[in-house]
Amino acid sequence: MRSTELVQWFRQSTPYVNMHRGKTFVIMLDGNTIASSNFINIINDISLLHSLGIKLIIVYGARVQINSLLAQNNVTSVYHKNIRVTDPRTLELVKQAVGQLSYDITARLSVRLPHSPVLNVVSSNFILAQPIGVDDGVDYMLSGKIRRIEIDNIKHHLDNNAIVLLGPIAPSVTGETFNLPFEEIATQVAIKLKAEKLIGFSSTQGILDPQGISIPDLLPQDAAKYLNQYIQQGEYHCSQARFLQAAIEVCKAGVKRSHLLSYEEDGSLLQELFTRDGVGTQLSVDNSEDIRIATVQDIPGLIELIHPLEQQGILVKRSREQLEMDIANYTIIDRDGVIIACAALNQYPEENMAEMACVAVHPDYRSSSRGDILLEAIQKRARQLGIEKLFVLTTRTVHWFQERGFRLANVEDLPKEKRDHYNYQRRSKILIQPLNEEE
């Protein structure tokens, strides 16, 4: 990196350094991540986060290491509903694998960065477990679930500048030890602590779309679709599926953002947290976004968003002057100061109709539900204005609108003013949706 690039990166990252300081992050490290050749760099980056004043809880899994140890000892695991049935022999090997990882992670975190203080890593009985019991006639034996989390104790250590380390085994009040899914621990700890972020790692740079391209942003409903795909493909235990399970649950419970990154690419953690767009997949409700009416200050961003679509002939060209005149008609989605989606609501009062026009979503966010969010916002605004029918003219997205309750219509069904200016050369399809609740 050249010196000018380094200076620019520092300047761009400063707001995020200030934003993250004092916040609580829960970091999931599964067995694949720990076994990767890049793990030492991930640990170093975690240490750097701690030095920047971020409160960290590391929750680690050991499935890969456990399976390897079981195979070496000719022990075969039985699964029921995707949960390992842990008998006493299996538990001894689980404890061996987990104990080794706990020591290794602590040792690596204890390696001091130059001119930095020694890290205090705390691993204790913060989790109390209880047996899962019997389900459909199957006894899970020493496979357990969370009974209680000592949240106040965890907070005490975080406030005293310690990193809290949690593994996938926990004691019970009766003195037994149970094997727990590490994603369940990460989920419940993040929720109970009201963490700012949940962070996980996988072999891919986030969740990939069908073309193999990383999806930068997902809403919970979109994430659930990808999770179902992994499950249907028999990949219930893959890193992506286990992260999505946790991320969807914590997101619904109020954790603002979850991030899935590649454990193979050096620096992913820092790039995700200290740049605007990151490198992996972020799951959020929409806390980083603002859905609002556009103002004249938004016109440059609107032009940047819609110009490529105008060039492709997907949208009708609009002059800057026209945008200025109609700016109050536009609803936009603003993500950290960047307009990533827009739609206009043009009224025709005489017929009590309105057009949803100039619908555009930034390419990086088209695999998410931003279109649905815009449609809901436009529908809500139209109803507030007393509009009875909403219509669209489109050359490319007929099916998308039909799936959302619009019906094909004719030119004669348009308001007179729109009908008189209909462009027969574009041959846009006309779709109309009644907005009355009873319809």
Swiss-Prot record:
Pathway given in the UniProt record: Amino-acid biosynthesis; L-arginine biosynthesis; N(2)-acetyl-L-ornithine from L-glutamate: step 1/4
Stretches assigned to the N-acetyltransferase domain: 289-429
One cellular component (GO) term of this entry: cytoplasm
EC number(s) given by UniProt: 2.3.1.1
Subcellular location: Cytoplasm
Entry annotated with the keyword Transferase: yes
Key words of the record: Acyltransferase, Amino-acid biosynthesis, Arginine biosynthesis, Cytoplasm, Transferase
GO biological process, one term: L-arginine biosynthetic process
Catalysed reactions listed for this entry: L-glutamate + acetyl-CoA = N-acetyl-L-glutamate + CoA + H(+)
Pfam family, one: Acetyltransf_1
Keyword Membrane assigned: no
Top-level taxonomic group: Bacteria
Gene Ontology molecular function terms on file: L-glutamate N-acetyltransferase activity
Extra information: In bacteria which possess the bifunctional enzyme ornithine acetyltransferase/N-acetylglutamate synthase (ArgJ), ArgA fulfills an anaplerotic role.
Family: Belongs to the acetyltransferase family. ArgA subfamily.
The protein, known as: Amino-acid acetyltransferase
Natural source organism: Mannheimia succiniciproducens (strain KCTC 0769BP / MBEL55E)
Name of the coding gene: argA
